Design a protein with these regions (language model features):
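C-terminal structural segments of small proteins and small subunits
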Residues: 61-76
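Generic structural concept
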Residues: 9-12, 33, 67
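Surface/interface-facing alpha-helical segments and adjacent flexible terminal/loop regions used
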Residues: 6, 80-83
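Generic N-terminal initiation segments characterized by hydrophobic and/or small/turn-forming residues
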Residues: 5, 56-59, 67
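Juxtamembrane/interface motifs at transmembrane-helix termini
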Residues: 47, 66-69, 81-82
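N-terminal acidic leader/helix
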Residues: 1-24
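Amphipathic, hydrophobic secondary-structure cores in small proteins
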Residues: 16-62
Length: 83
């Protein structure tokens, strides 16, 4: 894992740790995913999704779920723009 990807994994885990205090798991996942979608550069988002697709080493459970959701939304959006 490159140092850049390690940094992204750490940031995703830190963000999910913050949202882990939500009483509902779905809210924690949504909060993490929304934060990444709003505040991360598109290149960073593509890198973390690619890392997840390669196995997602180091991603915590909430961060992994958030990146999976982000990847699903990105796939839906690109499918909509190409049709």
């Amino acid at each position: 894992m490159s140092s850049n990807v390690e940094s992204l994994v750490k940031m995703a885990n830190d963000i999910s740790d913050y949202f882990a205090s939500e009483p509902d798991r779905a809210s924690a996942v949504d909060g993490t995913m929304t934060h990444i979608r709003r505040f991360w550069d598109p290149r960073m988002r593509r890198q973390i999704v690619a890392h997840l697709e390669a196995g997602g080493e180091g991603l915590g459970e909430l961060a992994r779920a958030a990146v999976q959701k982000l990847a699903g939304q990105a796939g839906t959006q690109s499918a909509q723009t190409t049709s």
